């Protein structure tokens, strides 16, 4: 397993902050509070279009390493539960979170734009907008259920910094 080289503590991890651990082998994301309390565990994928052990090329798995949540795009708040067809909404789902690399893990392999989002064009419309849409591979992002992004991840961003560690097959 390939793991992050750094920890949230290297970037000022403090009370109110959260650490989400994404394990692509188990297909789970687990959130931990600053004091080590397990907050929740949900299904997720950190898979791209390539081999299970490949993340160094465009459209392959999420590069392993430590990230933090940056910009938030809350399309669900803008358009509600029953929007008309839209390609962007279909691809990214209810809410998208930019993941800011903290280990140069994207740039060193010529990648950029890794996110955590829902949706899934392979699910069609309105399937990609469903609360618990099937999790399909991405072009390298972390995909979660739309409702988990809204009900579990989004509230954490209001409390403090959310760090995300991605573990990949090696």
Go through the PLM ranges and name each one:
Residues 1-12, 162:
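Extracellular/luminal recognition modules and glycoprotein regions
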Residues 2, 17, 29, 126-127, ...:
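Intrinsically disordered/low-complexity terminal segments and short unstructured peptides
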Residues 7-115, 119:
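Gly/Pro-biased beta-strand-loop elements
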Residues 76-170:
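Exported/periplasmic cell-wall-interacting domains
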